């Protein structure tokens, strides 16, 4: 980088549009969409798609709902030519879909292009030429008048060829390539030359496509350019005003949104922003931005993972894990505060109300995503995320104080491993902490069974204590109090919760007991799970008794160590 970039790079001059209207407008309907994945996207690949992959992507674009699809550059590629012929000859184009083909402004290429789409019921022929000063001066050595003559001649030639094939409904699309770097008056003159030569009118619309061939200014400047053209193009009622934003400055989506506010009727782009250099505008992001504002995009991304898989298989370009809406991590929260907010948001969300879950701009379920990956746990996570995973995946709803206790257990694990742990890992850690007997581990007290007397006030426990099988009896005003009495420990039960986990034949009772033990600071939790609620309650009491006794023993060991020191 140089010390003074202004000596090398000139800022783009703002557009003189003092009465601009677009900033106060909102987008209330979806634009017409044109997918250029099979042309602009394909020509930007390390290895362009073969016929099989092109067909796979074409079918996916149709399934998504695109009504206009640019299928290739048939005059530049035999593969593209053959692909277009296959679509037409095998009648693979749905009745509500129109294909588009592209050609440069040369007679031989135009003729080859028209030949490629011969017999199609509908076809858009996309004719373009560069108009910006640098291209006129450096590349072509042409004056403005010569450029206008080139446009008039080649649009006229295309009209001559297509008029001879009345069985096809022909539409002209004209693009002043490098529009965003061209003087507005020159762009307007170029477009009017094409419009007038073609003869736009009722039943004979012309698509005027205005590209940011290379994005060279902020998105608001592009919007000013579009609004200026929108005001000056005639006959506007017979013109479809289209935009083709690129992403060289990283603002392709913003440029497209501003352009729609400024008067654009149609947007060209690619799935996931594929395309030359930094790519075309990403239609997935643009469409779902509309969706999250309550405007249906008329494209179906209800299985976003399937769309991503097809795109990746056809282009060999992976979707970035942070890609808006589609990436593997975009609905994932590792941060403890984020997880807590999401958990509370899900709990408060009205299924029939407006979506208001913090940190999630869209319901992942609308895109076919599960909630499994929304909360993921690493050393930065907190109790909210851990509680969310246990509740969603296992039906375990922990009291708030228990969330604090168990999150410390998980934190120690993630700090030690320095890795993320998933829902299965958390469940295993939960079982290891609170349900150790079910994992085959040995505790000071192990439960084997119980018998209640007829009144429910007395209990006989079948236990192993320090490995010795024995039977203990106790009395109380219920199974929990009777179990505490039978154990003979100075333990006080502070709270008890029960709920069902699972459903049908898999349903089990989950009991959670909070208790305190004399000589141990604070309280602790125990858990029991069984098809029988009384059994689950007894197991929970024994679980917390074991955990509190471990803490008591650890405290005693620490005291001895201090005395010896």
Briefly describe each language-model feature range:
Residues 135, 210-212, 240, 268-276, ...:
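Short beta-alpha connecting loops at secondary-structure transitions
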Residues 214-350:
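Catalytic alpha/beta core domains of metabolic enzymes, predominantly
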Residues 1-107, 369, 374-377, 381, ...:
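N-terminal capping/small domains of soluble enzymes
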Residues 1-39, 294-473, 505-510:
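A mid-to-C-terminal "edge-of-domain" accessory segment
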Residues 490-519:
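Generic long, charged, amphipathic alpha-helical segments
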Residues 40, 44-45, 74-78, 132-134, ...:
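Short, small-residue-enriched loops and turns at beta-alpha junctions
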Residues 521-562:
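Mixed-charge, glycine-accented linear interaction segment located at domain edges/termini
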Residues 4-9, 33, 46-68, 84-90, ...:
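Alpha/beta enzyme core
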């Amino acid at each position: 980088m140089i010390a003074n970039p202004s000596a090398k790079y000139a800022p783009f001059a703002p557009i003189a549009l003092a009465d601009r209207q677009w900033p106060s407008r909102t987008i209330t309907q979806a634009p017409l969409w044109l997918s250029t994945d099979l042309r602009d996207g394909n020509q930007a690949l390390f290895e362009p798609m073969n016929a099989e992959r092109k067909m796979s992507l074409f079918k996916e674009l149709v399934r998504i709902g695109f009504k206009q699809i640019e299928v290739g550059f048939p005059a530049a590629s035999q593969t593209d030519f053959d692909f277009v012929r296959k679509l037409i000859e095998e009648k693979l184009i749905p009745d509500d879909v129109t294909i588009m083909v592209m050609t440069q402004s040369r007679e031989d290429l135009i003729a080859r292009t028209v030949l490629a789409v011969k017999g199609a019921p509908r076809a858009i022929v996309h004719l373009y030429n560069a108009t910006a000063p640098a291209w006129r001066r450096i590349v072509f050595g042409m004056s403005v008048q010569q450029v206008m003559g080139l446009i008039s001649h080649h649009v006229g030639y295309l009209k001559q060829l297509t008029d001879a094939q009345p069985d096809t409904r022909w539409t002209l699309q004209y693009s002043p390539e490098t529009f965003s770097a061209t003087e507005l008056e020159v762009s307007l003159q170029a477009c009017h030359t094409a419009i007038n030569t073609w003869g736009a009118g009722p039943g004979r619309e012309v698509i005027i496509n205005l590209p940011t061939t290379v994005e060279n200014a902020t998105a608001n400047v592009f919007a000013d350019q579009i609004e200026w053209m929108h005001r000056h193009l005639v006959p506007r009622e017979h013109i479809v005003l289209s935009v083709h934003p690129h992403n060289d400055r990283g603002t392709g989506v913003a440029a497209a949104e501003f352009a729609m506010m400024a008067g654009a009727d149609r947007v060209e782009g690619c799935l996931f922003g594929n395309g030359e250099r930094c790519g075309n505008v990403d239609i997935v992001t643009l469409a779902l931005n509309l969706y999250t504002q309550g405007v249906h995009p008329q494209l179906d991304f209800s299985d976003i993972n399937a769309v991503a898989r097809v795109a990746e298989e056809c282009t060999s370009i992976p979707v970035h894990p942070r890609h808006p809406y589609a990436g593997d991590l975009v609905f994932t929260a590792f941060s403890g505060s984020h997880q807590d907010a999401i958990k509370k948001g899900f709990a408060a969300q009205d299924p029939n109300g407006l979506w208001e879950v913090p940190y999630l701009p869209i319901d992942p379920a609308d895109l076919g995503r599960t909630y499994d990956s929304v909360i993921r746990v690493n050393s930065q996570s907190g109790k909210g995320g851990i509680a969310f995973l246990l509740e969603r995946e296992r039906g375990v709803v922990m009291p708030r104080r228990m969330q604090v206790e168990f999150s410390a257990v998980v934190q120690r694990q993630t700090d030690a491993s320095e890795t993320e742990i998933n829902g299965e890992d958390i469940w295993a850690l939960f079982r290891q902490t609170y349900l150790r007997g079910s994992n085959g581990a040995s505790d000071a007290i192990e439960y084997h069974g119980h018998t209640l007397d007829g009144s429910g006030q007395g209990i006989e426990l079948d236990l192993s204590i320090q490995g010795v099988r024995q039977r203990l009896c106790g009395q109380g005003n219920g199974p929990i109090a009777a179990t505490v009495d039978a154990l003979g420990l100075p333990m006080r039960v502070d709270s008890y919760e029960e709920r069902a986990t699972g459903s049908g034949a898999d349903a089990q009772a989950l009991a959670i007991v909070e208790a305190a033990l004399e000589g141990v600071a604070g309280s602790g939790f125990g858990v029991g799970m069984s098809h029988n609620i009384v059994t689950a309650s007894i197991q929970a009491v024994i679980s917390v008794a074991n955990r509190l006794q471990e803490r008591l023993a650890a405290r005693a060991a620490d005291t001895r160590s201090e005395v010896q020191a």
